[in-house]
Amino acid sequence: MGMVITIDGPAASGKSSVSRELARRLGWQWVSTGAFYRGLAFAALQLQIDLDDVSTLASLTHDPVWSVKMDDERTRVFFKDQDVTDQIAHEDVGNFASKVSHYPEVRKALLDAQRNCSAGPQGLVAEGRDCGTVVFPTAEAKVYLTANSEHRAARRAAELGLDHEDMVKAQQQRDLQDSTRKVAPMAVPEDALVVDTTALNLNQVVDAVVEYVKNKI
């Protein structure tokens, strides 16, 4: 495997946009590890599997009824051979995904799948909430993106067409769940480059990350 760069951070901090553009500039592979949890959550919701049915959820991680595939533009999720990538962005899917991520049995199964993502000869850009701390703890370069909660809520509300105040509350709850879960809580990786994206545009953030990566190569 080539070099691995991890990009972590809370929801709507800019992880996906930055990771995708960074991978494009470098000519590397890009994977969103969160897509695995959202894909599982979407499948569970479609199959009406109860959130508390841990054994069935763990078994579903290996069920071919859903799958994750990477291409040059995004990490795609398929359910019954249909591309549902846009649908997994919905808040109900994200909330379900955050809750099932607390289960060690589910995390272990999906962790194996995430680590099996193939990197090209140059490298892999891996984006998520625990890439630098859990999925790829020995990655050569680690980045943590953050932004104030109001700014993140505004981004997410505009993206999904939802009420801003409702989104603020939803994201605060999601951040609490992700940062306090007993298994692999969201945290800033040791020695990571921390970038506050609140007042920066996409190119400014990517430029900063590229300079950081150059010093690691």
UniProtKB/Swiss-Prot annotation:
Q: What is its main location?
A: cytoplasm
One biological process GO term for this chain? pyrimidine nucleotide metabolic process
Protein location:
Cytoplasm
What reaction gets catalysed by this protein? Answer: CMP + ATP = CDP + ADP; dCMP + ATP = dCDP + ADP
Task: Write the record's keywords in alphabetical order, separated by commas.
Answer: ATP-binding, Cytoplasm, Kinase, Nucleotide-binding, Transferase
Q: Offer a single GO CC term for the protein.
A: cytosol
> By its UniProt entry, which Pfam families does this protein fall under?
Cytidylate_kin (PF02224)
An annotated Gene Ontology molecular function = dCMP kinase activity
Entry EC number(s): 2.7.4.25
- Residues noted as binding ATP in the record, renumbered to the chain: G9, P10, A11, A12, S13, G14, K15, S16, S17
Transmembrane regions listed in the UniProt entry: none
- Protein family per UniProt: Belongs to the cytidylate kinase family. Type 1 subfamily.
Name of the protein = Cytidylate kinase
* Originating organism: Bdellovibrio bacteriovorus (strain ATCC 15356 / DSM 50701 / NCIMB 9529 / HD100)
Q: Which gene encodes it?
A: cmk
